[in-house]
Each structure stands twice: as C-alpha cells, then as structure tokens.
Amino acid sequence: MIVGIGTDIVQVSRMTALLGRYGERFPRRILTGDEFKKFSVSKQPAYFLAKRFAAKEAAAKALGTGFGSGLRPCHIGVGHTERGQPFLEWQGRANELVRILGVSRGLLSLADEKEYALAFVTLLAEREGAKPGLSLERALNSLKLSGNGNGVTD
C-alpha cells in the first residue's frame, strides 16, 4: 500500500549560490555525516547538493509533514547500492515517523538535466487497511506526547 508520495525539483545554480554564501555551513546543516564525507570529495558539489536536497524535500513531502515538527533535512539520508540505485536512510525524527506510519520501504528516483535535479519518492507499507492520513495525525501526536514535537532535534 502506498503511504505517501513526494517530488521536488532543485535548480543547481541555487545550490551554487548557497555554497558561495555559506560555504560548508549549508551542507553541514542538511547532510548526514556519511553524505558530508562524500560531498567533501565530490567533483561537482553543487550537483551533489541539488540531488540530495531534492531527495530530502521529496521524502519529507511523502511523509506528509514537509520539514516541520522537528523533521530536518539531516534526518533523511541518500545512499546508493553497488549498482548505483539510490535509496533512503532514516535517522532521528524521520526514523520515528516511518516507524509510526508503518513504512516498510521507501523508493527513490533521482534525475538531473543541466541546471536541474529532480527526485521522486514513494513510501510503501505492508499492512493491509492502513490509513496514512490518520497515521500521520497519530504520528505527530505521538511525537508531541513523547516530548519530541517541540522542534528540538535529536
């Protein structure tokens, strides 16, 4: 069953401008530790960031929250299999949300063309009769009740 879908497009020149303005502060804020290591040796850092940022935005949209309720870009990671297939990695608040929503698998597709990077995310659950909208409300309420809904990051 599909729990959520999300898509995002990022202009590479926007990432170039952010890198010029903030230097490493911007990638350190949005990337996971593993992603930052790869970013540090990337030959095309703006393209690297554009793809990662698009993937993180698309995943946040698929979760139904966007970036809010304590969910930050660094809670969503992007990795690749040995054959190059991209996949999502959940950390912190994102990990809590996918667990509460019953997400069993996240599918990620990435594309780029000249000045743009695009990401599409589909979140799947194995359980029958799941109600994603109700689950999202329950997830957000659960985070508030556990003291994690105040925007404090893990």
From Swiss-Prot:
Documented EC number(s): 2.7.8.7
Entries under Gene3D superfamilies matching the protein: 4'-phosphopantetheinyl transferase domain (3.90.470.20)
Any single biological process term in GO: fatty acid biosynthetic process
Enzyme class of the recorded protein, top EC level: transferase
This protein's record includes keyword Iron-sulfur: no
UniProt keyword list: Cytoplasm, Fatty acid biosynthesis, Fatty acid metabolism, Lipid biosynthesis, Lipid metabolism, Magnesium, Metal-binding, Transferase
Short name of any one Pfam family annotated for the protein: ACPS
SUPFAM superfamilies referenced in this protein's UniProt entry, alphabetically: 4'-phosphopantetheinyl transferase
Positions with a binding annotation for Mg(2+): D8, E57
InterPro entries reported for this sequence: 4-PPantetheinyl_Trfase_dom, 4-PPantetheinyl_Trfase_dom_sf, ACPS, Ppantetheine-prot_Trfase_dom
Cofactor(s) demanded: Mg(2+)
Main location: cytoplasm
Gene Ontology cellular-component terms listed: cytoplasm
Subcellular location: Cytoplasm
A single MF term (Gene Ontology): holo-[acyl-carrier-protein] synthase activity
Catalytic reaction equation(s): apo-[ACP] + CoA = holo-[ACP] + adenosine 3',5'-bisphosphate + H(+)
Cited HAMAP family: AcpS (MF_00101)
Free-text function comment from the UniProt entry: Transfers the 4'-phosphopantetheine moiety from coenzyme A to a Ser of acyl-carrier-protein.
Family under the similarity heading: Belongs to the P-Pant transferase superfamily. AcpS family.
Protein name (record): Holo-[acyl-carrier-protein] synthase
